[in-house]
Amino acid sequence: MIKFFLLLGLSLILNAAQIEKELLYNKYTLKDQYSYGKKSTRQFQWEKINTYLDKLEDFEKTYPTLGFVANYKNINGSPALINGETIDSDGVPRNQAIPLYNPNNLSTPAKYGRDGSLVAIISRYEQFSLIKSFSRDGEWMVPNRYLDEISSNDFNKAIFIDRKNQNIVTMDKINETWKVRSMNPVTTGRNHPPFSAPTPLGTYIVQEKKYKMLYLKDGSSDIIEGYSPYAVRFTRGAYMHGIPVNLPRTEMIEYSPLLGTEPRSHMCVRNATSHAKFIYDWSRINQTLVFVID
């Protein structure tokens, strides 16, 4: 078990690992605890972050082969309904999901897995693999076409997105020390169907990067409304990106005073554009973890 205490507000000392602040991006940096509005405060949830890092260390030691499940835009096939329903008992929707089967029943999926989720690969068979999800209980059988193996089981880049406090942390693991690289405000996805949804909780792999991610006008299948710069995708259509630019404007926008306030995005995580560029340049596809927490 990794334990820590705050030392002079500068570093977190651990008995098995260490978290230290050594920023590589230092614009719009937030304090460990900071004022929000007139009467409330927000914070970086270091205890919760430490718990996840502790769990990750155990996960990596327990399972030699890691990977992630993927079905962006249903590229690997839309999964079957669960008892006629398009959402599972945990609230995970069918769209762009991965079918999770009980090992003793491969006829109908029992749950849906979220695109990009971190998993351990326990056993491989001709058509299915037995996996253990990092973010949910149980072992599951998954059709092999939805599963991607990762070459290493020792992650050294992590991003924590906090929906409750509307902030983000980026971290590098150097030897046994996790270095905090940035601490910044964001806005996450809001619950406003049918076009907006909360950024889903879970642990994901960075899967894709786009210098400019084009987005459509709500309700349209072909009208481009604008673009989001330095977009890094981690699950379904959820990206970390800079401030959106609505056409006819084309030049990038650096900052919005709405960052760090309330959820406002469709599902994405909106950053200052220079911070989005930092994440875009710093992160590694299939090698960077994204933890979405509350």
Regions found by a protein language model. Name each.
Residues 19-70, 111-146:
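SH3/SH3-like beta-barrel superfamily modules
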Residues 107-112, 195, 279-282:
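Short, surface-exposed secondary-structure edge patches
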Residues 74-156:
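Non-catalytic extracellular/periplasmic "stalk"
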Residues 115, 200-201, 285-286:
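Short, flexible surface segments
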Residues 7-16:
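Hydrophobic h-region of N-terminal signal peptides that target proteins for export
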Residues 124, 143-250:
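Gly/Pro-biased beta-strand-loop elements
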Residues 18-59, 213-294:
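Exported/periplasmic cell-wall-interacting domains
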Residues 1-7:
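Sec-dependent signal peptide recognition
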